[in-house]
């Protein structure tokens, strides 16, 4: 696995690089957004770890720009901002997960591995509920044969809902899919991801297909 680390603090960047390499992965380390763009385009990383306080372009701006350009790799954010509003902003920008500073390197590694487990390929298989189609091997959602660009976590939610078409999926069940490690779970994350997912679906298919069932969870159903 190739990891892109975007962090302007040289010492922290070095520690992250060493730890990730020791885990058996390849690492490209960038000190600013310009260098990050270069590695993104030239080395095609599998996941990016992005600090928000970059010198040339704010990390949130970088993430939004990548997502608007259909960059779909998982993104883990490093941030010193601790309020729930800041966390919601990070997720709304297109990040898949975040770690607040100060942090233990072990937590960064655990969250990175959790993201990659969610993004790993499966045996070739397609779930078709016209006009919706999920390609399990490519981890892609298509509506009317148009691929919808989803983040790793958005895709996992969509796959889980479609696998349970017509059945209510609890928030706890979705959290388990996203975060197998219990200590990494934060329930409000689902609400943010679900809001993003609904917007992307409605841009291509205006009818409501994901319903919130009060006190129970979420329901995917074609009417």
Swiss-Prot record:
The keyword tRNA-binding does not apply. Residues 124-222 bind DNA. Pfam families: Response_reg, Trans_reg_C. It is found in: Cytoplasm. The modification 4-aspartylphosphate is found at residue 51. Its main location: cytoplasm. Keywords: Activator, Cytoplasm, DNA-binding, Phosphoprotein, Repressor, Transcription, Transcription regulation, Two-component regulatory system, Virulence. Residues 2-116 form the Response regulatory domain. Phosphorylated by PhoQ. GO terms for cellular component: cytosol; protein-DNA complex. GO terms for biological process: regulation of DNA-templated transcription. One of its GO terms (molecular function) is phosphorelay response regulator activity. Member of the two-component regulatory system PhoQ/PhoP involved in virulence and adaptation to low Mg(2+) environments. Necessary for resistance to killing by polymorphonuclear leukocytes (PMNs) and cationic antimicrobial peptides (CAMP) they produce. This is Virulence transcriptional regulatory protein PhoP.
């Amino acid at each position: 696995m190739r990891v892109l680390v975007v962090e302007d603090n040289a010492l922290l960047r070095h520690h992250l690089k060493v730890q990730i390499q020791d885990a058996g992965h390849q690492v490209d380390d960038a000190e600013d957004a310009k260098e990050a763009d270069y590695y993104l385009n030239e080395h095609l990383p599998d996941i990016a770890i992005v600090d928000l306080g970059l010198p040339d372009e704010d990390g949130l701006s970088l993430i939004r720009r990548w997502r608007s350009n259909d960059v779909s790799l998982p993104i883990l954010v490093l941030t010193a901002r601790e309020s729930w509003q800041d966390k919601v902003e990070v997720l709304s920008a297109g990040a898949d997960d975040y770690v607040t500073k100060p942090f233990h390197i072990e937590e960064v590694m655990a969250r990175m591995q959790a993201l990659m487990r969610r993004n790993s390929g499966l045996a070739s298989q397609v779930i078709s509920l016209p006009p919706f189609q999920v390609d399990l091997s490519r981890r892609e959602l298509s509506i009317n044969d148009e691929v919808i660009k989803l983040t790793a976590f958005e895709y996992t939610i969509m796959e889980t809902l479609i696998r349970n078409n017509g059945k209510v999926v609890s928030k706890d069940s979705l959290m388990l899919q996203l975060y197998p490690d219990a200590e990494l779970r934060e329930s409000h994350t689902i609400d943010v991801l679900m809001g993003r997912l609904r917007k992307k679906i409605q841009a291509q298919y205006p009818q409501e297909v994901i319903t919130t069932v009060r006190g129970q969870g979420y329901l995917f159903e074609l009417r």
